[in-house]
Curated annotation (Swiss-Prot):
Protein name, UniProt field: Cobalt-precorrin-5B C(1)-methyltransferase
Family of this protein: Belongs to the CbiD family.
Pathway: Cofactor biosynthesis; adenosylcobalamin biosynthesis; cob(II)yrinate a,c-diamide from sirohydrochlorin (anaerobic route): step 6/10
Gene3D superfamilies referenced in this protein's UniProt entry, alphabetically: CbiD-like
Domain of life: Bacteria
Pfam families xrefs: CbiD
Any GO molecular function: cobalt-precorrin-5B C1-methyltransferase activity
Keyword entries, A-Z: Cobalamin biosynthesis, Methyltransferase, S-adenosyl-L-methionine, Transferase
Catalysed transformations (reactions): Co-precorrin-5B + S-adenosyl-L-methionine = Co-precorrin-6A + S-adenosyl-L-homocysteine
Alphabetical GO biological process terms: anaerobic cobalamin biosynthetic process; methylation
Gene source species: Pseudomonas aeruginosa (strain UCBPP-PA14)
Protein's UniProt keywords contain Cell membrane: no
Amino acid sequence: MREETPEQPAPLRSGYTTGSCATATSLAAARLLLGGTISDAVQIVLPKGQQVLMRLEFCRAWENGAEAGTLKDAGDDPDVTHGALVFARVRLGAEPGVRFHAGPGVGTVTRPGLTLAVGEPAINPVPRQMIERHLAQLAAERGYAGGFEVAIGVEGGAELALKTMNPRLGILGGLSILGTSGIVRPFSCSAYIASIHQGIDVARANGVRHIAACTGNASEDAMRRRYGLPEIALIEMGDFAGAVLKHLRKAPVEKLSLCGGFGKISKLAGGHLDLHSRHSSIDLPQLAGWAAALGASTALQDSMRAANTSQQALAQAHAEGVALGDAVCAHALRFARGIVPTEVALEVFAIDRQGNLVGQACEERR
């Protein structure tokens, strides 16, 4: 029998953004157009100066131009685009500079509020700058005075985009080409937080005055039922309550409704901005203490401290007529109020696993 040894977890592997993929493929295709040879890899420089060699799946002539493709490698990050083919189709243009186009699988901006104008292909500013810089250097090396027409595409991007926030943000037809550093850090969650900020910005730019930030589908459904809010007003915050609350400091709305499962809201009430179990946990003694302030018996408090889950503690409290759900929401509102500007009206709702409302706290405003 093989002797057991302690597991030594391997370090998580970083990957490359779609912006890096778009840069590498644009450079390879443009180089071929300007007399270069077909190669199976291309070197690019990332925004912070790192040089990386990216493998190409193909680099070939295409219609009146050239095209190149690479497989997106997200490393150990759970990225929806991992393994997708990102490609660039490049033609020479008469005017200097780069004109960008949305190829198959890349979306187009249809709503104001993003960093790109309505009608623009969803190729974000930093990837655009990376492509422009590399093609300008190539043109200078080859003595080429014209410009480039660059279309970026992602195979299957239209279908993959349905798994992202793009449809809600008004980016239609495909994915966005993203990245600020060129590198995907495993579990950094930066893209998700950026999508939360974009969701708020798009809602504001389209005249939405009341948004609901929700931890999941059940809480979104609860807010739809209560207010009939349009999709653009529903912000899928997941575990990142802090991303919503802090962004409202510089991008306020008239009213914010926070809604989530009772356990998530109890974490917010306890002063946590990241509601994921990796970063915060349910504080059952704290729940028992709040129940005590509402007149809970000593026996109930002891029972709540020994509960297996927050839902069990909530059920125990409600069985004795202790309005723990409302109290937790009130504590969460008080904590959030310390972050959000006073001009933003706040309310907090908690739901159970069936989506039923189990607590609420709403500010009264004259």
